[in-house]
């Protein structure tokens, strides 16, 4: 068929198919005539403006130097815009009346789809057609130029049966999303717009989330494809930002009130409730009961839903909220002499933490069972952590007493020794315990309690699965340590932070090439010369590091050498276009696709 051949070789092809003389007709007329000028004049008379009201205008326009091409182009554009407006109005009518007329229009107009000036009319008809015949979709897919000009509403009908093409469209967006998250985490100039600062509502207004929501529209099949991409990529990379995107995408569709999708996603109400808690930074009794009800009422045969729920809870923003809320409750229990095991909201938070931290293992093993919360975390670890917290409170109170009262006060009892053995023992065995210890470290750093920070930092390298070296935590920790820059002049602070914590994680590239370079960028002038030299040697990038890291390291060296206080802006590393969706399996939804 003529329509299936590339448009660039047949510019204007299609007019003859709707009985309008086009290039082929004119070429034939000029090559077979005896008088070309007469042939052209005849062609103009036959195919020019036929309206009696407009034809008398032509001589006048000629006098004003207006070319016939400009006149006809202007006229065509005006008529085209009116026709498109009429088609869009038709698209709002009742389906029975609309579909029949649009189908007739499509049959008549589609042959001219390769005429660029007329293509918008054809695209408007397609955009308003709910169910497009496959023969048209195949032509659009086959021609790159036509596909590029096709509206998203039409592309959705193409993507539903072409997962690889949809993956090609989605892949750059997923890569962009990961780059944006990592830029916030690693940007050495960023001290204010920290990772956990934006609200959920602001985050899901981001470009990538909104584009994905628009691409999906109301299509359950496309939504499920995206979820399968996210599950597969999370499984392949362990990158928790895919979990964030899963939650943000669902809530973006919630904001848009896409009932076709949110009404059948079994995670919707749970994610909505959790999102409200994160937004308000609080879990009240009502919401805690709702969240617990979702977890308790998963029916037999629907256990696979736990996989998606665990991804929602593995989102760093969810982990941050759950852990921060748990630390707040522990402080409340200390002040009110309560027991951790008696606080049902605390138990629920720990239960959700355990589920979120097991997301990768659950999806990898396909064993959809909620992990059992170790009761000893509640009965032994939390009391030990609370004793550490009481020590810090007593020491803080003691420091506020007048100097003459300190020696006689009971608080002269030492509250600065090593962390309780139970704390160190349980963070080695439990991810939940590790997260709580890490977030208590952030709490003490926020208070600039140097002794409190050092007591916990000394044991954090023992956290299960190297949790303490994950990017969101290190990002937050470094941001809180930078304002404590005066402490870096003391040997005990450097010994604990660098020798006992940082150096234990040097094998992880993100620790050396990202977070430590940012820390040294701001505190290098407070460090003893010998310590700074040792750190710079340990941080020196290798051939395995990208050019951006090498450049940042070199500028840091210059900054140290000159004592510069200004912060030059380092260009972001070049965009990588490697698709993260290579070899992604065909989606297998756990609910009915419509």
Curated annotation (Swiss-Prot):
The GO annotation for biological process reads: negative regulation of transcription by RNA polymerase II; negative regulation of transcription elongation by RNA polymerase II; positive regulation of transcription by RNA polymerase II
Its signal peptide is none
Q: Which Pfam families match?
A: COBRA1 (PF06209)
Which locations, inside or outside the cell, does it occupy? Nucleus; Chromosome
UniProt-recorded Gene Ontology molecular function terms: RNA binding
Query: What InterPro entries is this protein classified in?
Result: COBRA1
**Per the annotation, which location comes first and is thus the protein's main one?**
nucleus
Query: Cellular component GO terms, alphabetically?
Result: chromosome; NELF complex; nucleus; transcription repressor complex
| Record's keyword terms, sorted | Chromosome, Nucleus, Repressor, Transcription, Transcription regulation
Q: Which family does it belong to?
A: Belongs to the NELF-B family.
Q: What does this protein do?
A: Essential component of the NELF complex, a complex that negatively regulates the elongation of transcription by RNA polymerase II.
Assembly, per entry: Component of the NELF complex. Interacts with Clamp.
Q: What is this protein called?
A: Negative elongation factor B
Lineage of the source organism? Answer: Eukaryota, Metazoa, Ecdysozoa, Arthropoda, Hexapoda
């Amino acid at each position: 068929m003529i329509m299936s051949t590339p448009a660039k070789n047949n510019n204007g092809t299609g007019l003859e198919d709707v009985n309008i003389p086009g290039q082929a007709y004119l070429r034939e007329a000029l090559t077979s005539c005896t008088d070309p000028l007469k042939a052209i004049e005849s062609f103009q008379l036959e195919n020019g403006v036929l309206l009696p009201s407009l034809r008398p205008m032509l001589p006048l326009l000629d006098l004003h130097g207006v070319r016939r091409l400009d006149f006809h182009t202007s006229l065509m554009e005006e008529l085209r815009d009116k026709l498109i407006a009429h088609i869009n109005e038709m698209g709002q009518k009742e389906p029975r009346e609309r579909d029949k007329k649009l189908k007739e229009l499509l049959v008549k107009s589609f042959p001219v789809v390769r005429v660029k000036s007329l293509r918008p009319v054809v695209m408007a008809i397609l955009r308003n057609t709910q169910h497009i015949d496959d023969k048209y979709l195949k032509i659009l897919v086959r021609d790159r130029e036509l596909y590029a000009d096709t509206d998203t509403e039409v592309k959705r009908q193409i993507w539903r049966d072409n997962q690889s093409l949809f993956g090609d469209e989605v892949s750059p967006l997923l890569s962009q999303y990961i780059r944006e998250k990592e830029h916030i985490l690693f940007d050495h100039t960023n001290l204010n717009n920290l990772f956990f600062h934006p609200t959920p509502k602001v985050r899901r207004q981001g470009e990538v989330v909104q584009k994905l929501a628009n691409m999906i529209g109301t299509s359950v099949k496309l939504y499920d494809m995206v979820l399968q991409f996210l599950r597969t990529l999370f499984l392949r990379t362990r990158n928790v930002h895919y979990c964030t995107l899963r939650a943000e995408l669902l809530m973006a569709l919630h904001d848009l009130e896409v009932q076709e999708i949110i009404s059948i996603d079994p995670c919707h109400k749970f994610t909505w409730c959790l999102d409200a808690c994160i937004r308000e930074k609080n879990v009240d009794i009502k919401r805690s009961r709702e969240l617990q009800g979702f977890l308790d009422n998963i029916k037999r045969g629907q256990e696979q839903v736990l996989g998606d729920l665990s991804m929602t809870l593995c989102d760093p923003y969810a982990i941050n909220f759950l852990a921060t809320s748990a630390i707040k409750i522990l402080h409340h229990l200390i002040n009110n002499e309560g027991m951790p095991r008696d606080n049902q909201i605390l138990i629920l938070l720990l239960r959700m933490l355990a589920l979120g931290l097991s997301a990768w293992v659950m999806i990898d093993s396909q064993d959809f069972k909620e992990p059992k919360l170790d009761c000893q975390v509640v009965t032994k670890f939390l009391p030990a952590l609370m004793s550490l917290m009481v020590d810090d409170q007593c020491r803080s109170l003691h420091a506020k007493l007048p100097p003459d009262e300190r020696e006689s006060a009971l608080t002269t009892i030492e509250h600065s020794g090593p962390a309780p053995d139970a704390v160190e023992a349980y963070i080695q065995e439990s991810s939940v315990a590790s997260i709580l210890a890490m977030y208590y470290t952030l709490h003490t750093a926020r208070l600039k309690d140097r002794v409190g920070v050092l007591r916990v930092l000394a044991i954090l390298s023992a956290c299960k699965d190297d949790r303490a070296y994950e990017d969101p935590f290190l990002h937050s920790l470094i941001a809180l340590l930078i304002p404590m820059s005066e402490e870096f002049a003391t040997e005990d602070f450097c010994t604990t932070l660098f020798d006992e914590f940082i150096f234990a994680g040097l094998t992880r590239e993100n620790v050396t090439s990202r977070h430590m370079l940012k820390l040294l960028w701001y505190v290098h002038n407070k460090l003893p010369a010998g310590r700074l030299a040792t750190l710079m040697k340990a941080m020196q990038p290798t051939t395995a590091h990208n050019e951006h890291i090498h450049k940042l390291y070199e500028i840091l060296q210059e900054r140290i050498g000159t004592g510069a206080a200004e912060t030059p802006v380092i260009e972001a590393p070049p965009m990588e276009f490697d698709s993260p969706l290579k070899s992604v399996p065909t989606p297998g939804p756990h609910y009915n696709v419509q």
